[in-house]
Amino acid sequence: MSKFVVKPTNSLSGCLKVPGDKSISHRSIMLGSLANGVTKISGFLEGEDTLSTLKAFQDMGVKIEYNGDNVTIYGVGLNGLKKPLTPLDLGNSGTSIRLISGILAAQKFDSELCGDESLSKRPMGRVINPLTKMGAMIESNNGKLPLKIKGGQALNGIHYDLLVASAQVKSCVLLAGLYAKGETCIKELAPTRDHTERMLKGFGYKIDVNKNKICLIGGTQLNAFAIQVPSDISSAAFFMVAASIAPKADITLTGVNINPTRIGVIDILKLMGANLSLSNEREIGGELLADIRIQSEQLKGIRIPEELVSLAIDELPVIFIAASCAKGETILTDAKELRVKESDRIQVMADGLSILGIKNEVLEDGIKIQGGVFSKPGIVIESHHDHRISMSFAIASLRCQYIIEIEDVDNVKTSFPNFVELANQIGMNINLVNS
């Protein structure tokens, strides 16, 4: 087990390109495998989660070649997957397990999905229920992993109102809908990332999006195309906050995905007074990209608009760090989904902020954070095996007077394998220590 030992620094500068978007990397493997023809991917995120997806489709008979961030997939078509010889172990990846369950629900063969200890605690009823309504047969461990999916079931399209704002559930049902008889429609509670919808269009699949309603009709084939994966805004967010809170900072992040369903973190930081600007905006493969420049600025506490929560759900832990450095109080509500991520991110972040000396009040669906000073020596933070917790508290070191130690950081490799390298490149001082 490894830990971060982070020494305080006060000046950041440079230009970075963070790794490829995790959500898009997952979906490119899945849809490329189900397409007819050869899909070539550049900018693929070589993290543990995305490699779990890649290996799962290799285990189902798909020929996939990869060299760093370049991947070539020889698609087998919608009905070309083969029964895996063993249960598919998706490690820590909730995206993999939930989206792949939608695909496997329609296959002719039986299958089983499992994951690590953390993933095995996360709720799967949210995908089991709509898939069962479509005609799937799925056994679970009281709504948790492992999932045993019975093959040979004929699926029927459904009209389904999402009970949680979840792109994973939405995508699971849409992927099952590719195989279903008739129309499948999803109605969203709130906007969530729309990479599945955009990529289906890229593969030539007709999908209708009308505000919060997404519909498709099963039975059409997917056709391969080239995919260029933009940099992940969830990874870029750590450096956006870093530059905002550092005493002196001026950094630029290049080629970052600014899909409208992902820019909640930008909107929130701007509301807090961040000195943040976008340039060189362009569109590649149906996704919007931009270069983002961030300079240090005194932030102010805000009430985070509830309509931005689902658009920044993965970035909220590092926004907590921004809030702890802001002048005044920041209030977050309507973020109950944070409690069922890799950890209970509301409680775990609150505990860590308390260790740093920051006053906070935990709410059922959020938190109140009073900006302050990180003044305590001998700080040791437990990450609870959650990559975003580890990286968020590493960023907090920029406002600390003393060394911070963050325990159990191996999980950073799931989403941002070169985080330490890039952080140190712009002036941070993070040592990865095997403990």
Curated annotation (Swiss-Prot):
Residue numbers binding 3-phosphoshikimate: K22, S23, R27, S166, Q168, D314, K341
Amino-acid biosynthesis recorded as keyword: yes
UniProt record, GO biological process: amino acid biosynthetic process; aromatic amino acid family biosynthetic process; chorismate biosynthetic process
Subcellular location: Cytoplasm
GO terms assigned for molecular function: 3-phosphoshikimate 1-carboxyvinyltransferase activity
PANTHER family documented for this protein: AROM/DEHYDROQUINATE SYNTHASE (PTHR21090), PENTAFUNCTIONAL AROM POLYPEPTIDE (PTHR21090:SF5)
Protein name according to UniProt: 3-phosphoshikimate 1-carboxyvinyltransferase
